[in-house]
Amino acid sequence: MKNIKDELQHIILGDEQAGRTSQLKKVQTFLRRHAETSSATQNQKRFKGKEAAELINFARQEKLFYEQTISEKDFISSGAEQRVYRLDETYVIKTNGSIFYEYWLDYFNSLLIHNYYFPATAYTFIGFKIIGDELYAVVRQEFVSTTEATDLAAVKQFLTYNQFFNTRNNDYINSDLGIIFEDLHDENVLSKNSVLFFVDTIFYLTLKFYSKD
């Protein structure tokens, strides 16, 4: 378990940029440094607004805006936090305004944790987009076609094996790692040929995650 925690801490706290996560890590590193230099006395709403403004400036400087049109004719589905569009026969793109997270940094941390655990459905960050005067992240993910309904008991068994224990409904926690894993219902975890694919995940890092024990 310690080796896993060391690896995850290195992913979240390190500055390396490699492979398809390079743009994702670039943004996460910027947000982490911004958080470290910002006043801890700012309230959450004010800080996230300032964070978004700084993020827009950073995205302009680094040319991180997704300039292609996202057409509603390619719309597939939506949830409270994002909208999903077909990109081609292999991939979908998702727009997410990070409403499930206190800060944009938390959202990008969640993407990095997802990519560590679930490389088969890894997110590739492809840019930001302003939609209706709001900032959205745009990510690409391989499309998963299901062959059967998801067995939530199998999801629970899989997560328990990996030391994520059910707390309520479809929410889990790994207390040793300090990671909360939420909202794992049958639209966020898909099943193809009896293999589970985690396609929409929400990870939160607790203070325990940052400890050295």
Specify the residue positions occupied by each region the protein language model found.
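Juxta-kinase regulatory segment immediately upstream of eukaryotic protein kinase catalytic domains
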Residues: 1-72
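ATP-binding glycine-rich loop module of kinase domains
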Residues: 38-48, 69-120
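Structural motif
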Residues: 87-88, 131-133, 192
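Protein kinase-like catalytic core scaffold
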Residues: 91, 121, 137-139, 180, ...
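Active-site ExK catalytic segment of metal-dependent nucleases
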Residues: 92-98, 142-144, 200-202
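Conserved structural core of kinase catalytic domains
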Residues: 97, 115-170
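Active-site-adjacent loop/helix micro-motif of nuclease/hydrolase catalytic cores
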Residues: 100-109, 149-154, 210
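Catalytic activation segment of kinase domains across protein kinase-like and atypical kinase folds
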Residues: 173-213
